[in-house]
Protein backbone atom coordinates (compact mmCIF):
# COMPACT_ATOMS: atom_id res chain seq x y z
CA UNK A 1 0.00 0.00 0.00
CA UNK A 2 2.86 2.33 0.80
CA UNK A 3 4.30 1.65 -2.62
CA UNK A 4 0.97 2.43 -4.30
CA UNK A 5 0.73 5.68 -2.34
CA UNK A 6 4.28 6.60 -3.34
CA UNK A 7 3.50 6.02 -7.03
CA UNK A 8 0.35 8.13 -6.78
CA UNK A 9 2.35 10.97 -5.24
CA UNK A 10 4.94 10.80 -8.05
CA UNK A 11 2.21 10.87 -10.69
CA UNK A 12 0.59 13.91 -9.06
CA UNK A 13 3.92 15.75 -9.12
CA UNK A 14 4.36 15.03 -12.84
CA UNK A 15 0.83 16.12 -13.62
CA UNK A 16 1.07 19.39 -11.68
CA UNK A 17 4.56 20.34 -12.82
CA UNK A 18 3.48 21.72 -16.25
CA UNK A 19 0.83 23.81 -14.58
CA UNK A 20 3.32 25.27 -12.14
CA UNK A 21 5.63 26.11 -15.05
CA UNK A 22 3.01 28.20 -16.81
CA UNK A 23 3.67 31.96 -16.66
CA UNK A 24 1.65 33.59 -13.94
CA UNK A 25 -0.86 36.24 -14.98
CA UNK A 26 0.47 39.63 -14.04
CA UNK A 27 -1.54 41.37 -11.37
CA UNK A 28 -1.75 45.06 -12.25
CA UNK A 29 -0.31 47.42 -9.69
CA UNK A 30 -2.85 49.73 -8.14
CA UNK A 31 -3.15 52.98 -10.05
CA UNK A 32 -1.29 55.83 -8.49
CA UNK A 33 -3.55 58.34 -6.87
CA UNK A 34 -2.87 61.69 -8.57
CA UNK A 35 -1.65 64.44 -6.32
CA UNK A 36 -4.11 67.31 -6.53
CA UNK A 37 -2.68 70.48 -8.02
CA UNK A 38 -3.06 73.37 -5.61
CA UNK A 39 -5.36 76.03 -6.99
CA UNK A 40 -5.50 79.65 -6.02
CA UNK A 41 -8.29 80.49 -3.69
CA UNK A 42 -10.68 82.76 -5.55
CA UNK A 43 -10.79 86.20 -4.00
CA UNK A 44 -14.16 87.77 -3.68
CA UNK A 45 -14.45 90.97 -5.66
CA UNK A 46 -14.44 94.04 -3.49
CA UNK A 47 -17.93 95.45 -3.04
CA UNK A 48 -18.67 98.44 -5.24
CA UNK A 49 -19.37 101.25 -2.79
CA UNK A 50 -18.83 104.58 -4.48
CA UNK A 51 -18.65 108.21 -3.44
CA UNK A 52 -19.15 111.05 -5.90
CA UNK A 53 -16.78 113.99 -5.77
CA UNK A 54 -18.47 116.67 -7.86
CA UNK A 55 -17.44 120.13 -8.92
CA UNK A 56 -19.26 121.39 -5.81
CA UNK A 57 -16.76 119.50 -3.64
CA UNK A 58 -13.84 120.71 -5.76
CA UNK A 59 -14.89 124.27 -4.98
CA UNK A 60 -13.93 123.54 -1.36
CA UNK A 61 -10.50 122.06 -2.19
CA UNK A 62 -7.26 124.05 -2.09
CA UNK A 63 -5.66 124.07 -5.56
CA UNK A 64 -3.10 126.77 -4.70
CA UNK A 65 -0.16 124.35 -4.94
CA UNK A 66 0.57 120.68 -5.47
CA UNK A 67 1.37 120.35 -1.77
CA UNK A 68 -1.85 122.01 -0.63
CA UNK A 69 -3.90 119.94 -3.06
CA UNK A 70 -2.22 116.70 -1.99
CA UNK A 71 -2.95 117.44 1.65
CA UNK A 72 -6.58 118.34 0.92
CA UNK A 73 -7.31 115.25 -1.14
CA UNK A 74 -5.49 113.09 1.40
CA UNK A 75 -7.95 114.18 4.07
CA UNK A 76 -10.87 113.71 1.69
CA UNK A 77 -9.78 110.21 0.62
CA UNK A 78 -9.10 109.17 4.20
CA UNK A 79 -12.65 110.15 5.06
CA UNK A 80 -14.00 108.24 2.07
CA UNK A 81 -12.00 105.17 3.06
CA UNK A 82 -13.15 105.40 6.68
CA UNK A 83 -16.81 104.93 5.73
CA UNK A 84 -16.06 101.73 3.83
CA UNK A 85 -16.27 103.09 0.30
CA UNK A 86 -14.15 101.38 -2.35
CA UNK A 87 -14.57 103.65 -5.38
CA UNK A 88 -14.18 107.39 -5.93
CA UNK A 89 -16.15 108.91 -8.82
CA UNK A 90 -14.22 112.13 -9.32
CA UNK A 91 -15.67 114.74 -11.65
CA UNK A 92 -12.75 115.69 -13.87
CA UNK A 93 -14.61 117.28 -16.80
CA UNK A 94 -17.42 119.42 -15.38
CA UNK A 95 -17.90 122.25 -17.93
CA UNK A 96 -16.14 121.28 -21.15
CA UNK A 97 -12.93 121.80 -19.20
CA UNK A 98 -10.58 119.53 -17.29
CA UNK A 99 -8.85 118.99 -13.97
CA UNK A 100 -5.78 117.82 -15.89
CA UNK A 101 -3.70 119.06 -18.84
CA UNK A 102 -5.59 118.09 -22.00
CA UNK A 103 -5.20 118.46 -25.71
CA UNK A 104 -8.98 118.83 -26.03
CA UNK A 105 -10.20 120.84 -23.07
CA UNK A 106 -8.82 123.83 -21.15
CA UNK A 107 -7.98 123.68 -17.46
CA UNK A 108 -11.08 124.01 -15.34
CA UNK A 109 -11.82 127.25 -13.55
CA UNK A 110 -12.02 125.13 -10.42
CA UNK A 111 -8.23 124.89 -10.38
CA UNK A 112 -7.40 128.60 -10.30
CA UNK A 113 -10.64 130.54 -10.56
CA UNK A 114 -10.05 131.20 -14.25
CA UNK A 115 -10.80 128.72 -16.99
CA UNK A 116 -7.74 127.88 -19.06
CA UNK A 117 -5.20 128.90 -16.43
CA UNK A 118 -2.60 126.25 -15.60
CA UNK A 119 -2.36 125.58 -11.85
CA UNK A 120 1.24 124.45 -12.25
CA UNK A 121 0.60 120.79 -11.47
CA UNK A 122 -1.59 117.91 -12.60
CA UNK A 123 -4.46 117.47 -10.13
CA UNK A 124 -5.74 114.25 -11.67
CA UNK A 125 -2.34 112.55 -11.57
CA UNK A 126 -2.02 113.34 -7.87
CA UNK A 127 -5.59 112.19 -7.25
CA UNK A 128 -5.11 108.84 -8.99
CA UNK A 129 -1.91 108.14 -7.04
CA UNK A 130 -3.45 109.14 -3.72
CA UNK A 131 -6.54 107.00 -4.29
CA UNK A 132 -4.59 103.93 -5.34
CA UNK A 133 -2.24 104.33 -2.36
CA UNK A 134 -5.34 103.80 -0.20
CA UNK A 135 -6.60 100.84 -2.26
CA UNK A 136 -9.44 102.97 -3.61
CA UNK A 137 -10.47 102.78 -7.25
CA UNK A 138 -10.63 106.06 -9.11
CA UNK A 139 -13.13 106.51 -11.93
CA UNK A 140 -12.96 109.64 -14.05
CA UNK A 141 -16.37 111.29 -14.08
CA UNK A 142 -17.15 113.19 -17.26
CA UNK A 143 -20.06 115.46 -18.06
CA UNK A 144 -19.96 115.09 -21.84
CA UNK A 145 -22.17 117.97 -22.99
CA UNK A 146 -22.35 120.79 -20.47
CA UNK A 147 -20.32 123.92 -21.25
CA UNK A 148 -21.98 126.41 -18.93
CA UNK A 149 -24.64 126.42 -16.23
CA UNK A 150 -26.17 129.84 -16.67
CA UNK A 151 -23.10 132.01 -17.20
CA UNK A 152 -20.76 129.80 -15.15
CA UNK A 153 -17.93 129.47 -15.83
CA UNK A 154 -16.66 132.39 -17.86
CA UNK A 155 -15.33 130.74 -21.01
CA UNK A 156 -11.75 131.06 -22.19
CA UNK A 157 -10.58 131.06 -25.80
CA UNK A 158 -9.68 127.36 -25.63
CA UNK A 159 -13.19 126.26 -24.67
CA UNK A 160 -14.82 124.01 -27.27
CA UNK A 161 -17.60 126.60 -27.39
CA UNK A 162 -15.12 129.21 -28.58
CA UNK A 163 -13.18 126.94 -30.91
CA UNK A 164 -16.27 125.33 -32.45
CA UNK A 165 -19.26 127.65 -31.95
CA UNK A 166 -21.30 125.60 -34.42
CA UNK A 167 -21.12 122.66 -32.01
CA UNK A 168 -22.93 124.53 -29.25
CA UNK A 169 -26.63 124.89 -28.50
CA UNK A 170 -28.08 127.27 -25.92
CA UNK A 171 -31.05 126.87 -23.61
CA UNK A 172 -32.39 128.85 -20.69
CA UNK A 173 -30.22 126.74 -18.38
CA UNK A 174 -26.89 127.18 -20.15
CA UNK A 175 -24.74 126.10 -23.07
CA UNK A 176 -24.28 122.53 -24.26
CA UNK A 177 -22.41 120.62 -26.91
CA UNK A 178 -24.95 119.32 -29.41
CA UNK A 179 -25.36 115.54 -28.93
CA UNK A 180 -26.73 115.21 -32.48
CA UNK A 181 -23.48 116.49 -34.00
CA UNK A 182 -21.20 113.66 -35.13
CA UNK A 183 -18.11 115.83 -34.64
CA UNK A 184 -19.16 116.46 -31.05
CA UNK A 185 -19.56 112.76 -30.38
CA UNK A 186 -16.14 112.04 -31.83
CA UNK A 187 -14.60 114.85 -29.79
CA UNK A 188 -16.08 113.42 -26.61
CA UNK A 189 -14.80 109.94 -27.51
CA UNK A 190 -11.33 111.32 -28.25
CA UNK A 191 -11.31 113.06 -24.89
CA UNK A 192 -12.14 109.79 -23.16
CA UNK A 193 -9.39 108.06 -25.12
CA UNK A 194 -6.93 110.68 -23.90
CA UNK A 195 -7.96 110.06 -20.30
CA UNK A 196 -7.54 106.30 -20.61
CA UNK A 197 -4.19 106.59 -22.37
CA UNK A 198 -2.62 109.02 -19.92
CA UNK A 199 -4.02 108.03 -16.55
CA UNK A 200 -4.43 104.75 -14.68
CA UNK A 201 -8.11 105.40 -14.05
CA UNK A 202 -10.26 102.43 -13.14
CA UNK A 203 -13.23 103.50 -15.22
CA UNK A 204 -14.98 106.29 -17.09
CA UNK A 205 -18.16 107.54 -15.49
CA UNK A 206 -20.79 109.53 -17.41
CA UNK A 207 -23.16 111.24 -15.01
CA UNK A 208 -24.87 114.51 -14.11
CA UNK A 209 -25.99 115.12 -17.67
CA UNK A 210 -29.27 115.02 -19.52
CA UNK A 211 -30.43 115.78 -23.02
CA UNK A 212 -30.30 119.56 -22.75
CA UNK A 213 -33.99 120.23 -23.41
CA UNK A 214 -37.22 118.77 -24.76
CA UNK A 215 -37.72 121.83 -26.98
CA UNK A 216 -37.98 120.61 -30.61
CA UNK A 217 -36.22 123.76 -31.82
CA UNK A 218 -33.03 122.75 -30.02
CA UNK A 219 -32.02 120.19 -32.64
CA UNK A 220 -34.65 120.63 -35.35
CA UNK A 221 -32.06 121.05 -38.11
CA UNK A 222 -30.09 117.99 -37.00
CA UNK A 223 -33.24 115.91 -36.77
CA UNK A 224 -34.37 116.90 -40.25
CA UNK A 225 -30.93 116.28 -41.72
CA UNK A 226 -30.68 112.82 -40.18
CA UNK A 227 -33.46 111.44 -42.39
CA UNK A 228 -34.41 109.08 -39.60
CA UNK A 229 -37.79 107.39 -39.40
CA UNK A 230 -37.58 107.41 -35.62
CA UNK A 231 -39.71 109.67 -33.51
CA UNK A 232 -37.73 112.61 -32.14
CA UNK A 233 -37.57 111.25 -28.59
CA UNK A 234 -36.37 107.85 -29.82
CA UNK A 235 -33.81 109.49 -32.10
CA UNK A 236 -32.47 111.58 -29.24
Please tell me what each predicted stretch does:
Residues 100-113, 146-172, 209-230:
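Aromatic- and acidic-residue-enriched segments that line the glycan-binding/catalytic groove
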Residues 43-71, 128-129, 139-198:
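Active-site-adjacent "subsite" loops/lids of carbohydrate-active enzymes
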Residues 49-53, 87-91, 137-141, 203-207:
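Structural recognition of the beta-strand scaffold that forms the well-ordered cores
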Amino acid sequence: MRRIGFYLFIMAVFLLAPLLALPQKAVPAPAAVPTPTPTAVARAAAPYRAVWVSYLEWEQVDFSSAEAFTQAIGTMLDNIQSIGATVVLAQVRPFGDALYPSGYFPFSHLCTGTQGQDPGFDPLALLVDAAHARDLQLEAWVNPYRIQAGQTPALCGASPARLHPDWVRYTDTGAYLDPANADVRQYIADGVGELCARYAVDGIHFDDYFYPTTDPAFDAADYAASGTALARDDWR
